[in-house]
Curated annotation (Swiss-Prot):
Residues 211-220 have a biased composition (Basic residues). It comes from the Eukaryota. Residues 19-31 have a biased composition (Basic and acidic residues). Belongs to the FAM246 family. Residues 1-47, 153-178, 191-232 are annotated as: Disordered. This is Protein FAM246A.
Length: 232
């Protein structure tokens, strides 16, 4: 015979088991990241449910009417099993979101990584094209500004001519003895080229070549008694 209060304990255990199954089903339906293995509560939920079903069936066998709690637990277990089968069929052949290896309890189905990678590559290509166009526009604008600045600047001053190194002047030889010899040679040539007519021939020519004596027109005093000239 059933002890009083035991149905309440069984109902509480069934509620806990149904809550665990509901959480498991919600996690399987959740597309978010999952752990590679089942948790501690998820692993113990099927055992608890099996023990609870065994207890309820044993009590129902002693009664003529199947309790409603047993039907509720069986329905919850069937729903959890169906959800697990659907989740397993959906995740069959999927790959790991981290390593890319196929596994049974994958986060993403097969092909999701390829699609994501293709979309990422397309987005990167579009960003590169947009950045390239903007960079070219900036370069053209900078060239125009530089040309305008060059036009405003004054012309550069002419570069100074290259400095020439002075040439080395050869040392002059002493010109004293050479000049003396040259002067002596010139004097000898001048003396030899003088004509013989320039030399005086005799005393007559000496008188002729002499300069005439200037007459003194000053009146000289005449002594008394001397005849005065002036007549023939």
């Amino acid at each position: 015979m059933a002890t009083p209060g035991r149905p309440w304990a069984q109902a509480r255990s069934a509620y806990r088991a149904s809550e665990v199954l509901r959480r498991v089903t919600g996690r399987r339906r959740d597309p978010g990241p999952q752990s590679n293995g089942p948790g501690q509560e998820d692993a113990r939920a099927p055992g608890r449910l099996a023990r609870l079903l065994g207890q309820l069936r044993a009590e129902a066998a002693s009664r003529s009417e199947v309790p409603r709690l047993l039907k509720l637990v069986e329905r919850a277990g069937a729903g959890a099993a169906g959800a697990g089968e659907r989740t397993g069929a959906h995740s069959r052949g999927s790959v790991c979101s981290v390593c890319g290896e196929p596994r049974g309890r994958a986060t993403y189905p097969a092909g999701v990584l390829e699609v994501s990678e293709r979309r990422l590559q397309e987005g990167l290509a579009a960003v590169r094209e947009e950045l390239g166009a903007e960079i070219e526009a900036l370069r053209a604008e900078l060239r125009a500004e530089l040309d305008a600045l060059r036009a405003l600047l004054p012309p550069p001053p002419p570069s100074p001519p290259a400095r020439r190194e002075p040439r080395a002047v050869p040392r002059a030889t002493p010109r004293g003895p050479t000049l003396l010899r040259t002067l002596g040679t010139v004097s000898a040539l001048v003396a030899a080229s003088r004509p013989a007519d320039d030399a005086p021939d005799g005393p007559a020519e000496c008188g002729a070549h002499r300069a005439p004596v200037r007459k003194n027109h000053k009146k000289m005093p005449v002594p008394p008694g001397a005849p005065q000239g002036g007549g023939d």
